[in-house]
Amino acid sequence: MCPLRSLLLISTLVLLHHLPHLSLGRSLPTTTAGPGTSCLDYSQNLLRAVSNTLQKARQTLEFYSCTSEEIDHEDITKDKTSTVEACLPLELATNESCLASRETSLITNGHCLSSGKTSFMTTLCLRSIYKDLKMYHMEFQAMNAKLLMDPKRQVFLDQNMLAAIAELMQALNFDSETVPQKPSLEELDFYKTKVKLCILLHAFRIRAVTIDRMMSYLSSS
């Protein structure tokens, strides 16, 4: 992987990390990932699913300040994970040649990469991504439980998105990992819950883009 490509990757990750109000684009069809699917395919499926879910939420909750310009942006992984730093291309961190790789390698149980052997830095990156996914999965499940109690039955989380998160988590296979967070259990205010849904979906879509960029980088390196 040449330095120019790595610099482009990390610039994209930092931009996504600090500019949460990027344009959303059109809804994309959701595909079902099958056996033997790589983590790049899973991450692309996840990005499609969260983009579709966010678009539907914006349409349904048009009177709830659900656009990226109107919401108060929040990152539930802040100070709990460090995906951008953990996924920094090794050559940028060590200033070695464009083919640099750390000698230490680990055997992973997941099937994200073609080989079961991955570098120490790659393992840290994938573990951080797993923690991100687990945090959002827990938060979305708790939020969906609240939405199901709403008498208006106005909006629910798309099960395709929850399934896409679970599929990528299963592929990463860091089941022993714990996350330093419990789902927020605020008062049962359906208006606030719907606004929070918009906030989380916007934040998670940005994180899904970051994950997809990293999986693309890892798959081609």
From Swiss-Prot:
<feature type="disulfide bond">
    <location>
        <begin position="39"/>
        <end position="112"/>
    </location>
</feature>
<keyword id="KW-0325">Glycoprotein</keyword>
<dbReference type="GO" id="GO:0042163">
    <property type="term" value="F:interleukin-12 beta subunit binding"/>
</dbReference>
<dbReference type="InterPro" id="IPR009079">
    <property type="entry name" value="4_helix_cytokine-like_core"/>
</dbReference>
<dbReference type="InterPro" id="IPR004281">
    <property type="entry name" value="IL-12_alpha"/>
</dbReference>
<dbReference type="GO" id="GO:0098586">
    <property type="term" value="P:cellular response to virus"/>
</dbReference>
<dbReference type="GO" id="GO:0032496">
    <property type="term" value="P:response to lipopolysaccharide"/>
</dbReference>
<dbReference type="GO" id="GO:0002860">
    <property type="term" value="P:positive regulation of natural killer cell mediated cytotoxicity directed against tumor cell target"/>
</dbReference>
<dbReference type="GO" id="GO:0005125">
    <property type="term" value="F:cytokine activity"/>
</dbReference>
<keyword id="KW-1015">Disulfide bond</keyword>
<comment type="subunit">
    <text>Heterodimer with IL12B; disulfide-linked. This heterodimer is known as interleukin IL-12. Heterodimer with EBI3/IL27B; not disulfide-linked. This heterodimer is known as interleukin IL-35. Interacts with NBR1; this interaction promotes IL-12 secretion.</text>
</comment>
<dbReference type="GO" id="GO:0001916">
    <property type="term" value="P:positive regulation of T cell mediated cytotoxicity"/>
</dbReference>
<dbReference type="GO" id="GO:0097191">
    <property type="term" value="P:extrinsic apoptotic signaling pathway"/>
</dbReference>
<dbReference type="GO" id="GO:1900747">
    <property type="term" value="P:negative regulation of vascular endothelial growth factor signaling pathway"/>
</dbReference>
<dbReference type="GO" id="GO:0034393">
    <property type="term" value="P:positive regulation of smooth muscle cell apoptotic process"/>
</dbReference>
<protein>
    <recommendedName>
        <fullName>Interleukin-12 subunit alpha</fullName>
    </recommendedName>
</protein>
<comment type="function">
    <text>Heterodimerizes with IL12B to form the IL-12 cytokine or with EBI3/IL27B to form the IL-35 cytokine. IL-12 is primarily produced by professional antigen-presenting cells (APCs) such as B-cells and dendritic cells (DCs) as well as macrophages and granulocytes and regulates T-cell and natural killer-cell responses, induces the production of interferon-gamma (IFN-gamma), favors the differentiation of T-helper 1 (Th1) cells and is an important link between innate resistance and adaptive immunity.</text>
</comment>
<dbReference type="GO" id="GO:0005615">
    <property type="term" value="C:extracellular space"/>
</dbReference>
<dbReference type="GO" id="GO:0032609">
    <property type="term" value="P:type II interferon production"/>
</dbReference>
<feature type="disulfide bond">
    <location>
        <begin position="87"/>
        <end position="125"/>
    </location>
</feature>
<dbReference type="GO" id="GO:0048662">
    <property type="term" value="P:negative regulation of smooth muscle cell proliferation"/>
</dbReference>
<dbReference type="GO" id="GO:0050709">
    <property type="term" value="P:negative regulation of protein secretion"/>
</dbReference>
<comment type="similarity">
    <text>Belongs to the IL-6 superfamily.</text>
</comment>
<dbReference type="GO" id="GO:0005143">
    <property type="term" value="F:interleukin-12 receptor binding"/>
</dbReference>
<dbReference type="GO" id="GO:0006955">
    <property type="term" value="P:immune response"/>
</dbReference>
<dbReference type="Pfam" id="PF03039">
    <property type="entry name" value="IL12"/>
</dbReference>
<dbReference type="GO" id="GO:0032729">
    <property type="term" value="P:positive regulation of type II interferon production"/>
</dbReference>
<dbReference type="GO" id="GO:0043514">
    <property type="term" value="C:interleukin-12 complex"/>
</dbReference>
<dbReference type="GO" id="GO:0050830">
    <property type="term" value="P:defense response to Gram-positive bacterium"/>
</dbReference>
<dbReference type="GO" id="GO:0045513">
    <property type="term" value="F:interleukin-27 binding"/>
</dbReference>
<dbReference type="GO" id="GO:2000510">
    <property type="term" value="P:positive regulation of dendritic cell chemotaxis"/>
</dbReference>
<dbReference type="GO" id="GO:0032816">
    <property type="term" value="P:positive regulation of natural killer cell activation"/>
</dbReference>
<keyword id="KW-0732">Signal</keyword>
<dbReference type="GO" id="GO:0035722">
    <property type="term" value="P:interleukin-12-mediated signaling pathway"/>
</dbReference>
<dbReference type="InterPro" id="IPR050676">
    <property type="entry name" value="IL-12"/>
</dbReference>
<keyword id="KW-0964">Secreted</keyword>
<keyword id="KW-0339">Growth factor</keyword>
<dbReference type="GO" id="GO:0008083">
    <property type="term" value="F:growth factor activity"/>
</dbReference>
<dbReference type="GO" id="GO:1903588">
    <property type="term" value="P:negative regulation of blood vessel endothelial cell proliferation involved in sprouting angiogenesis"/>
</dbReference>
<dbReference type="GO" id="GO:0046982">
    <property type="term" value="F:protein heterodimerization activity"/>
</dbReference>
<dbReference type="GO" id="GO:0050671">
    <property type="term" value="P:positive regulation of lymphocyte proliferation"/>
</dbReference>
<dbReference type="GO" id="GO:0051135">
    <property type="term" value="P:positive regulation of NK T cell activation"/>
</dbReference>
